[in-house]
Amino acid sequence: MKFIIVLLLLTALTLTSIPVIEGILKRCKTYDDCKDVCKARKGKCEFGICKCMIKSGK
């Protein structure tokens, strides 16, 4: 039973992090390149790679 719960948690985490991974993998030169990738999330261009920050509920 524990195994199934762990599996469900891992699946949920994987599904929620896909857009973030996509954003991290996107190559960029400027912040504007990251805007369309990160959309609602704040993004920054670091070492030529987009990094998206997930907005907290606050």
UniProtKB/Swiss-Prot annotation:
The record's tissue-specificity note reads: Expressed by the venom gland.
How is the protein modified post-translationally, according to the record?
This is a cyclic peptide.
Where does the record place the site Binds trypsin?
55
Principal localization reads secreted
UniProt site positions, description: Cleavage: 55-56
Per the UniProt entry, the dependence of activity on temperature is: Is very stable at high temperature.
> GO molecular function of the protein, one example?
serine-type endopeptidase inhibitor activity
Subcellular location(s) of the protein: Secreted
Question: What keywords appear on the UniProt entry?
Answer: Amidation, Disulfide bond, Knottin, Protease inhibitor, Secreted, Serine protease inhibitor, Signal
Additional observations: Trypsin inhibitor cleavage and cyclization are only observed in the presence of trypsin. It is suggested that the inhibitor Lys-55 is placed in the S1 pocket of trypsin, its C-terminal residue Ser-56 is cleaved, and the cyclization occurs via a peptide bond between residues Ile-24 and Lys-55. Negative results: does not show activity on voltage-gated potassium channels (hKv1.1/KCNA1, hKv1.4/KCNA4, Kv10.1/KCNH1/EAG1, hKv11.1/KCNH2/ERG1, hKv11.2/KCNH6/ERG2, and hKv11.2/KCNH6/ERG2).
Free-text domain note: Has the structural arrangement of an alpha-helix connected to antiparallel beta-sheets by disulfide bonds (CS-alpha/beta).
Free-text function comment from the UniProt entry: First cyclic scorpion trypsin inhibitor (Kd~0.5 nM). Does not inhibit chymotrypsin.
Protein name (database record):
Cyclotide trypsin inhibitor TopI1
